[in-house]
Amino acid sequence: MKETIISSMEKFIQKFFEELYLILFDYALKIAQNPIDELLIFGSIAIAYTVIYISGLFFARKINLPYIRKILEIGISVIFYFLVSLLEGKFPQVESLLLLKTLFLVQTIRVFILSLEAFQAFGFTTKLLINIFSILGGISFFIIKLSPFTRRKI
């Protein structure tokens, strides 16, 4: 009975976020008049996908709560960074390459989350993987930060 309830909840969550993604994508096509709109809307889609994967992993009981908290901290940090950068006017001209980098980073995070179980099969602990991914994330952040497309133009 418990397995049926969890399975039903997983299906409901997956369907809900598939619909949310379609609505967001349709909305993006209608109102994205400039790159800032695109960045914000694709950011929303990325957040929706992050929630899908966190929910799926949580209901599948593949990870523990501290790992979910770490994912949320990273996600909130990235969102906060983009919002502060927008408010400070650090994106006077958003290049399409920045969007590609952002989407690539989201895809990379998704691959890391999905491959967690495979890494654990080879004997890696969750704590070690979090540290490795945090270091890689930090390196990626500085590469993006130092990129000529994301630096403030003087």
Swiss-Prot record:
<keyword id="KW-0472">Membrane</keyword>
<feature type="transmembrane region" description="Helical">
    <location>
        <begin position="65"/>
        <end position="87"/>
    </location>
</feature>
<dbReference type="GO" id="GO:0005886">
    <property type="term" value="C:plasma membrane"/>
</dbReference>
<keyword id="KW-1003">Cell membrane</keyword>
<feature type="transmembrane region" description="Helical">
    <location>
        <begin position="39"/>
        <end position="61"/>
    </location>
</feature>
<keyword id="KW-1133">Transmembrane helix</keyword>
<keyword id="KW-0812">Transmembrane</keyword>
<protein>
    <recommendedName>
        <fullName>Uncharacterized protein aq_1012</fullName>
    </recommendedName>
</protein>
<feature type="transmembrane region" description="Helical">
    <location>
        <begin position="94"/>
        <end position="113"/>
    </location>
</feature>
<feature type="transmembrane region" description="Helical">
    <location>
        <begin position="128"/>
        <end position="150"/>
    </location>
</feature>
